[in-house]
């Protein structure tokens, strides 16, 4: 059973996150291993396995990027374990330039410039995310997979910038 079906949701990117949360809580209560403490060893093991599946499904579907990756996996794109990388040289060059800029910001410890950088990267991420949503809505799986790969780059860059921000604030 796929994760969307487990939570009673349609297999699409845009989901009702409130319904996801409520169903997660219901499933947690229903399959919590403590409820099977007096059951047979097989029942206890099944409850632990079901609980682990529910938790994994929840973690996957609640985050936009992992939800997109999972949806794409249902359509034959295994992005989680693939060796395929972004082939868009302009995008890759832009990423190198942004990484260099982040390094410069770190060297200069310029928190004002860092704040502007983070906002810029967030705008780039949001624009790509919107592009991906449209691609998934239109079942443009190849294009959506490529956009997810690019979003991974931007997500890592954003994370690096936020870590630098914490480092500069602690300094």
From Swiss-Prot:
Pfam family, one: HSCB_C
Family matches, as CDD domains: DnaJ
Domain spans labelled J: 2-74
Organism superkingdom: Bacteria
Membrane spanning stretches: none
Species per Swiss-Prot/TrEMBL record: Salmonella paratyphi B (strain ATCC BAA-1250 / SPB7)
Keywords noted in UniProt: Chaperone
Oligomeric and partner information: Interacts with HscA and stimulates its ATPase activity. Interacts with IscU.
GO cellular-component term (any): iron-sulfur cluster transfer complex
Main function: Co-chaperone involved in the maturation of iron-sulfur cluster-containing proteins. Seems to help targeting proteins to be folded toward HscA.
GO biological process, one term: protein folding
Protein name, as recorded: Co-chaperone protein HscB
Record family assignment: Belongs to the HscB family.
Gene: hscB
NCBIfam families from the UniProt entry: hscB, PRK05014.1
MF GO annotations: ATPase activator activity; protein-folding chaperone binding
Entry-linked PROSITE patterns: DNAJ_2 (PS50076)
């Amino acid at each position: 059973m796929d994760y969307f079906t487990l939570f009673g949701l349609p297999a699409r990117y845009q989901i009702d996150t409130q319904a996801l949360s409520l169903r997660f809580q219901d499933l947690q209560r229903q399959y919590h291993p403590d409820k099977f403490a007096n059951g047979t060893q097989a029942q206890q093991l099944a409850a632990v396995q079901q609980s682990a599946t529910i938790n994994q499904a929840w973690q996957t579907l609640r985050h936009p990027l992992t939800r997109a990756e999972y949806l794409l996996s249902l359509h034959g794109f295994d992005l989680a374990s693939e060796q395929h990388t972004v082939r868009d040289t302009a995008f890759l060059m832009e990423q190198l330039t942004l990484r260099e800029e982040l390094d410069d910001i770190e060297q200069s410890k310029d928190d004002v410039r860092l704040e502007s950088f983070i906002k810029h990267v967030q705008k780039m991420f949001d624009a790509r995310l919107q592009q991906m949503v449209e691609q998934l809505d239109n079942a443009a799986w190849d294009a959506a997979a490529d956009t997810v790969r690019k979003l991974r780059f931007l997500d890592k860059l954003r994370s690096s910038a936020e870590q630098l921000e914490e480092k500069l604030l602690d300094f």
